[in-house]
Structure formats: structure tokens, C-alpha cells
Regions:
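Anionic-ligand-binding alpha/beta catalytic cores of soluble enzymes and soluble regulatory domains
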Residues: 18-21
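C-terminal extensions
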Residues: 46-76, 102-170
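Flexible glycine/acidic-rich beta-alpha junction loops that bind and position SAM and/or redox cofactors
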Residues: 1-16, 32-61
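Residue-level signature of tetratricopeptide-repeat
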Residues: 94-95
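Conserved, mostly hydrophobic/aromatic
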Residues: 25, 91
């Protein structure tokens, strides 16, 4: 039996949050076309406790974003946090007939609180948003559960406190 410290003790279940993140990652690999090496790497060996694996991947690959809703292909749209398989099909079908707005995306089931950092509609982002890893991660954590900002271990957390100026458009 392996006595590695990173394993749960005998008779102890694995941490539920970790189990849930592994389930989400499995789902991404089965239905969204992700590879295990894309979700975790030598540099990033574990999942973030506060954001899901799809968001974590997107934040780590900001060079691929923002994605234009009107022109992005099926597999590119699948990689956008907040957009699932049903929403991708609806987007591709609807954009053949009209330009899509953020209101249209919301009606189609897109979770805009996650997707807004990674998409454009007609060349425009929903808000004046910085494509910055720390900024986006901070806002994703806050949007998921506002109390997460209080739960985060301040010693290991590199995320900065949100500023009122983050919400003011120039």
C-alpha cells in the first residue's frame, strides 16, 4: 500500500471538491474534445478549487480568446466557458439567419457570467474587460460564489482584491 501524503488516509474518502473536479475533467474529455495533457501539465498539476476545469483551461490559454460568436467553429465554441453542447448547436443554427447579441445568447442558455470574458458579438465584448489571467480568475471566483473570496487561503492566493475601477468603463 502506498503511504504517500497526498493520498487520503485509510478509511477516509477523497475530498469531495477534488472528486467533483475530476468528474468535470472527465466530462470535458468525453464530450468536449479535451485531452488530459491540456487540462493538467507539468507546470499545472492540480485543478483550481475555486473555478471549474474548463474555466481554468480558458484562463490559462487567453491567447485563443476572445472568440467571435458569428464565425467560430463548433469545437472552438465548445471550449468557451459557459457554453455547452446544446448552446453551441443553437448558436450555429441561429447565426445563419441573423447577427447574434448577448441577449440572444442568454436566451439560448449561454451562461454569460462565465462566457463574457471569452467571447465577442459582432466584434464587441459585453463589457470593457481586461484579458488578464489574474483579473478574470478573480471575477470568475467571485461570480461562482461571492463567499469564495473569503474562503481562499490568503497566503497561497495570488489574486488581487477587486477594485471599483474594474467595473468602470473608459
Amino acid at each position: 500500500v502506498n503511504m504517500d501524503e497526498s493520498l487520503p488516509g485509510i478509511g477516509q474518502p477523497p475530498p469531495l471538491k477534488r472528486e467533483h473536479r475530476l468528474y468535470q475533467a472527465d466530462f470535458l474529455m468525453r464530450f468536449y474534445g479535451f485531452k488530459a495533457g491540456e487540462l493538467l501539465s507539468e507546470d499545472n498539476q492540480s485543478f483550481n478549487d475555486y473555478i471549474d476545469p474548463k474555466c481554468q483551461w480558458a484562463v490559462g490559454h487567453l491567447e485563443r480568446f476572445p472568440v467571435e460568436i458569428m464565425t467560430a467553429d463548433y469545437y472552438t465554441l465548445l471550449r468557451v466557458p459557459g457554453i455547452g453542447t446544446n448552446s453551441v448547436r443553437r448558436i450555429i443554427k441561429a447565426r445563419k439567419h441573423a447577427k447574434l447579441s448577448f441577449a440572444d445568447l442568454k436566451k439560448m442558455g449561454v451562461v454569460l457570467k462565465r462566457a463574457l470574458y471569452f467571447i465577442t458579438c459582432d466584434g464587441r465584448m459585453m463589457y470593457n474587460t481586461k484579458l488578464d489571467e489574474s483579473y478574470i480568475t478573480r471575477h470568475l471566483i467571485y461570480n461562482e460564489r461571492p463567499d469564495n473570496m473569503l474562503l481562499a487561503d490568503n497566503k497561497s492566493c495570488t489574486y488581487e482584491q477587486m477594485s471599483i475601477f474594474d467595473f468602470i468603463s473608459e
